[in-house]
Amino acid sequence: SDITVAHVPGAFELPVTAAAMARSSNYDAVICIGAVIEGETAHFEYVSKEASDGIARLSVDTGVPVIFGVQTTYTTDQAFARIGHASGYAEAAVEMANLLRTLNDA
């Protein structure tokens, strides 16, 4: 298959895993999918921000599209309700990989 799935322990670990994949030259795009659900501490804000910043920085640093598919929600129900949008992540990955290939070939 042309798809590799890598499971990580949490959203905080997504950027380093995505970086390894993007820098390997084995992938045209990387999609990070997960959920960070607010708890009773500020941990939610820290994890969400670091995951978001790290993933965004990777696209620029590596030139490989890294798609942010991490849901940041207040409840588990909200996270499950949004999972239906996941096919859009694959579409964005293909679109960006094709666009960057076209720009690099120009």
Task: Walk through the language-model features, giving the residues of each.
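C-terminal binding/interaction regions
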Residues: F44, K49-A106
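Short, ordered loop/turn segments at secondary-structure junctions
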Residues: V8, G34-V36, V70-Y74
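Short beta-strand elements in bilobed, periplasmic/extracellular small-molecule ligand-binding domains
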Residues: S1-H7, F68
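Glycine-rich phosphate-binding loop
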Residues: E13-G54
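Active-site glycine- and acidic-residue-rich loops that bind
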Residues: A6-L14
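Short coil/turn segments at secondary-structure junctions
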Residues: D2, E38-A42, D77
